[in-house]
Amino acid sequence: HYLKPQPETLADPETFAFCVRVTLYAVAFGIKEVGEHDPEVRPIVLNLPDGTVEMRIEQGPAAHLTIKGGSFYPQRGPAENPNAILEFADLQTAWDTFQGNIDTFSAVGSGRIKLRGFIPLIEGVNPLMDRLAYYLSD
């Protein structure tokens, strides 16, 4: 219901913010499951550097994912010392990204999505996000 809400559900700003927050957390925790159990992405995971990626929405919620030896440790909230940060300018940008309704390359170019820190860590997590989207699609 909240991961794939109807448009009228998203019309309420508080419900929209809740849906984005729930989806952000689902992405962080879903990456763990995909990364540790999907044989398609396991080779990528085994070559990921150790570190912490923080996913956050400017002036909004955050989640982070620590990667160590091919295992994932997701948590809600900001990371103490992230190695890389994936930051969305606002709730709408985050939502559009999670729903696959945004050209991420142009969003990075326009500053709606900001990448900071050890970018190869974010690049390594990106295929896991894509694979998670595959599992969550209709």
What are these regions (language model features)?
Residues 1-138:
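Feature captures hydrophobic
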